[in-house]
A protein has these predicted regions:
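Glycine-/small-residue-enriched transmembrane alpha-helix faces in small-molecule transporters
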Residues: 1-38, 44, 75, 79, ...
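Helix-helix packing/entry segments at the starts of transmembrane helices
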Residues: 96-102, 165-186, 222-258
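C-terminal-most transmembrane helix of multi-pass membrane proteins
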Residues: 41, 210, 246-296
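Hydrophobic transmembrane alpha-helices of multi-pass small-molecule transport proteins
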Residues: 48, 101, 119-138, 267-288
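Hydrophobic alpha-helical transmembrane segments of multi-pass integral membrane proteins
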Residues: 7-14, 35-51, 123-128, 149-150, ...
Length: 296
């Protein structure tokens, strides 16, 4: 019989496959990044609220001491999705996803700092290798330097969100945390777009299959996937979570190549750099697992 950890790990791989599909959806949907994220978070929060009202009204309850953390989580995840989809819009799926692969490295560095543990030597070694890969990607796709930089910042936000939620799920109901983070993120995003003077009816106007794609993005790839991803954090470490998320670029890039073919093809150096990033992250994870096994 597989252990609870193995079941949760397998489930999370499926969730990451859905996350990989969001990058494709982001490219398929015609509206810009901020309205897209508002639709995504707003509809996802609405779907969870409807589920609570019909089946579990008590799920609306959130302990007072978690409110400030949930508020911060909503800001971080909203900013992460806006920067991620913006990077896709200006640089393409492959470039945005290649930078998201650095999330495990960023977590390996930030987690010890935030949680007060010693930074391990092997994390620095594999981190340096990852930096070499990122350097190659920057050099190979210099014309997309803005998109690369924004996607890298998005990976940082994703890492911070994972570490923050890794703490909260130990004391809060995952689906409740999901709802309030999505709700906070959508409200704050709406306030920003209203007061920035950028709000127009046209920016929220959906064309052709946009409604269909946004529905999949909001309900399947967000309400469902977001809740499950937080739930498995009770059984998996922040580093393991980010290790699996590092496979998202592989899923997403394969999907984008299948859908758009040569449009998403990039230079040889890009793929060499991407391979170095993925390899160093996977080797880091394998090494960490071996070290943990030796302690038992």
């Amino acid at each position: 019989m597989p252990s609870d950890r193995s079941k949760n790990l397998l489930l999370f791989h499926f969730i990451v496959l859905l996350f990989g599909f969001t990058s494709v959806l982001g490219a398929l949907i015609s509206i810009s990044a901020l309205p897209l994220v508002l639709y995504r978070m707003g509809l996802a929060a609405f779907g969870l609220a409807l589920y609570f009202l019909v089946f579990h009204p008590n799920y609306f309850y959130l302990p007072k001491h978690l409110w400030s953390k949930v508020f911060l989580g909503g800001i971080i995840i909203g900013a992460h999705w806006v920067t991620f989809f913006y990077a896709i819009k200006i640089a393409g799926v492959s470039i945005a996803l290649s930078m998201m692969a650095t999330g495990a490295l960023i977590t390996a560095i930030l987690d010890p700092i935030i949680n007060g543990r010693k930074l391990l030597g092997y994390e620095l070694i594999f981190g340096s290798l990852t930096s070499v890969g990122i350097g190659l990607i920057y050099q190979a796709e210099f014309k997309h330097i803005e998109g690369i930089s924004i996607a890298l910042f998005s990976a940082l936000l994703s890492s911070l969100f994972t570490i923050l939620n890794g703490r909260m799920v130990k004391i809060g109901r995952p689906i409740t945390l999901s709802f309030y983070e999505l709700f906070v993120g959508s409200i704050l995003g709406l306030i920003i777009i209203l007061f920035s003077g950028q709000f127009t009816i046209e920016s929220f106007e959906l064309k052709d299959l946009d409604i269909f794609w946004i529905s999949i993005l909001a309900f399947l790839c967000t309400s469902f996937a977001f809740n499950i991803s937080i739930k498995v954090m009770r059984h998996l470490s922040s580093f393991t979570i980010m290790m699996v998320i590092s496979l998202e670029p592989i899923y997403g890039i394969i999907l984008s190549l299948l859908i758009w073919n040569e449009k998403e093809y990039l230079s040889l150096n890009f793929y060499v750099g991407f391979l170095i990033v993925i390899s160093s992250i996977l080797m880091s994870g394998i090494y960490k697992l071996k070290k943990e096994a030796q302690k038992k």
